[in-house]
Amino acid sequence: MTPPEERQMLRETVASLVAKHAGPAAVRAAMASDRGYDESLWRLLCEQVGAAALVIPEELGGAGGELADAAIVVQELGRALVPSPLLGTTLAELALLAAAKPDAQALTELAQGSAIGALVLDPDYVVNGDIADIVVAATSGQLTRWTRFSAQPVATMDPTRRLARLQSEETEPLCPDPGIADTAAILLAAEQIGAAERCLQLTVEYAKSRVQFGRPIGSFQALKHRMADLYVTIAAARAVVADACHAPTPTNAATARLAASEALSTAAAEGIQLHGGIAITWEHDMHLYFKRAHGSAQLLESPREVLRRLESEVWESP
């Protein structure tokens, strides 16, 4: 298990890199780039942090970390809406590692950041799909590697996360699916928590500086209560996601996904309302968080599908 002090150091290192290289202007530049992410920042994350090697065992050239370590990095990237291939790459690595004999060469390339990975849960909406080199699909309880495939970018609500429609041309079976969709849900939930925390921070800062009726709007009791409620919602969701990272069961994954989706959607909606008209100007970041909230809530599975699955799991429990 990674010691808490090392995990905190990891968080601080990633946060420092993001603060230095992924400000609002840099995020917008990455959104508009050919590959949809900042390649120089990606190299820094791989070389200085080992972000793409965290979940790979040391004997295969990785850092030998845990799911919680990857979640910390994803959370910090989500906080700043950093366009990054880390989520898809990490999931592809975990899928490859599930095989009886993992492809060491592919894992090395992914760990170094020289190859980009993608996991196919829904072939119509694949994260990193248009830039992926290594693709693994999870269908009908099996993991399959797509050795040849075609990719077509699709329109998205969230400009900070590109998706693509993939079609397989040649495949090879890997192994039974150990539940990679649950892992994907947990990592996405961690990303949502980071974004929700930043939404609250932006809203509190604005409420302290925006003056109306001769006083900052944040001093009004009604707004204080709304922001306090939002803080509690995010803190509770953060705890649920942390628990899922340490015990990634299907029920915990579904619960984390629902809690994080609710936290981010609520934080983004409150942020839009409390900022007022400035929140929907292109120059402000809040509208990007709003789009990320709604795009992420529907990614992988819709909240309704997660609730339906969670309901069946709960009722089947002894």
From Swiss-Prot:
EC number: 1.3.99.-
Catalytic activity: 3-[(3aS,4S,5R,7aS)-5-hydroxy-7a-methyl-1-oxo-octahydro-1H-inden-4-yl]propanoyl-CoA + A = (2E)-3-[(3aS,4S,5R,7aS)-5-hydroxy-7a-methyl-1-oxo-octahydro-1H-inden-4-yl]prop-2-enoyl-CoA + AH2
Cofactor(s) listed: FAD
Keywords assigned by UniProt, alphabetized: Cholesterol metabolism, FAD, Flavoprotein, Lipid metabolism, Oxidoreductase, Steroid metabolism, Sterol metabolism
Record bears the keyword Glycosyltransferase: no
Ligand binding (FAD): R210, G277
Source species, domain of life: Bacteria
Function, as annotated: Involved in cholesterol degradation. Catalyzes the dehydrogenation of 5OH-HIP-CoA to 5OH-HIPE-CoA. Can also use octanoyl-CoA and dihydroferuloyl-CoA, with lower efficiency. Cannot use 3-oxo-4-pregnene-20-carboxyl-CoA (3-OPC-CoA).
Similarity comment: family membership: Belongs to the acyl-CoA dehydrogenase family.
Cofactor: binding details: Binds 2 FAD per heterotetramer.
Example of a GO MF term: acyl-CoA dehydrogenase activity
Pathway(s) this gene product operates in, as recorded in its UniProt entry: Steroid metabolism; cholesterol degradation
InterPro entries: AcylCo_DH-like_C, AcylCo_DH/oxidase_C, AcylCoA_DH/ox_N, AcylCoA_DH/ox_N_sf, AcylCoA_DH/oxidase_NM_dom_sf
Descriptive protein name: Acyl-CoA dehydrogenase IpdE2
Gene3D superfamilies: Acyl-CoA dehydrogenase/oxidase, N-terminal domain (1.10.540.10), Butyryl-CoA Dehydrogenase, subunit A, domain 3 (1.20.140.10)
Catalytic class of the enzyme: oxidoreductase
UniProt GO BP: cholesterol catabolic process
A Pfam entry, by short name: Acyl-CoA_dh_N
Quaternary structure and interacting proteins, as annotated: Heterotetramer composed of 2 IpdE1 subunits and 2 IpdE2 subunits.
Lineage: Bacteria, Bacillati, Actinomycetota, Actinomycetes, Mycobacteriales
